[in-house]
Amino acid sequence: MGPVPFAGQGRYGLAAMAILTQHTPREAREPRGFAGGIASLADDQLYALQNPFALDGRVSSYPASARGFAVANSYLLTQPDAAMLIDTGFGKDEPVIRAQIESLIAPGLPLSMFPLRLNEFMSINNVESFAGHFNVETCYTSNIDAALWFDFGAKAEGRDILKSMKVTAVTRADTIELGKDGRAIDVMQAPIRLIATRWLYDRATRTLFSSDMFTHIWRDTATGPWIVTDADNDPTSLRGVRSFMLNTRYWWLEGAPTDSIRRGIGNVFDKYDIETIAPGYGCILRGRNVVERHYRMLDEFLKSCDKSVAVSRYVTRDEER
């Protein structure tokens, strides 16, 4: 699927990249352009920390033929007395992401981290660095020995930081409470996954953090915009979603038993009131109509792939569908 053009600012007043409200510190409101940006998804509650990367055929998360730019998304959930970072970003972006976090929370504020994909760089690359720089209260993971996964050539002090970092293991169906007011964040095993993955749902902002799913929209330029809203003329098609899925890590779905996957995803959308889908990379989907449309396209794609109607076959390395 080709890049999706922007069709104007949405009714939420977000021009997607580095646009914040007057209540946010000045340094956080200033556009960061090619160096990344901050998007306020809910004032004083949820921010997307966005840092672009080029699509030049070397990024396995996108089809080999994709050209343009995508964006790695980290998310900062904030309360007056605590904050949580979802995914820590690529190591190349560590200084920028660190500055983004510093612009949004007070020094010393308790910070928790939750990398949703334990074996993917854009999720875990900066755990050790941030644990050493911020007042990290805990790191939520699906694996109690996850600290062993976060050592990317760290020096002795880095390894000591990881050893002393508190790790909180979460189950496949759990709830985290953020801050003394107990802001509820529901944890679930991703109903569609290739690697160990969790999805989260933030009740306060009605946001589903979908990790490596719903990542199928990229742009022509590094400046985005990186949010699709109800007001946009979003040209994403079922054919485009199908091509994206079959030319990335979910190439194996054609001819697989997808009915159970469809039921799992459907249960999530039936259970939760979702106004925003916040993927780990690619454009954020914002607004009930946008969310519903992209969910339906994914469901139709999965339906067409089921073994009852499709045949599994060998796919060569360079073949695109």
Residue ranges of predicted features:
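Active-site neighborhood of phospho(di)ester-bond hydrolases with catalytic His/Asp-centered motifs
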Residues: I86-T88, P110-N119, C139-S142, L208-D212, ...
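Cap/insert and terminal regions of metallo-dependent hydrolase folds
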Residues: I217-R321
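Active-site HxH/HxHxD metal-binding segment of metal-dependent hydrolases
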Residues: E102-I176, R296-E300
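Active-site beta-strand termini and strand-to-loop segments that position acidic
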Residues: L77-P80, L178-K180, L200-A204
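Zn-dependent metallo-beta-lactamase
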Residues: G2, A7-A82
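Active-site-proximal beta-strand elements of phosphoester/diester hydrolases
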Residues: Q45-N51, L85-D87, A184-Q189, L208-D212
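Metallo-beta-lactamase
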Residues: R29, L41, Y140-T197, A256-P257, ...
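Active-site environment of divalent metal-dependent phosphoester hydrolases
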Residues: D56, L118-N125, A146-W149, D174, ...
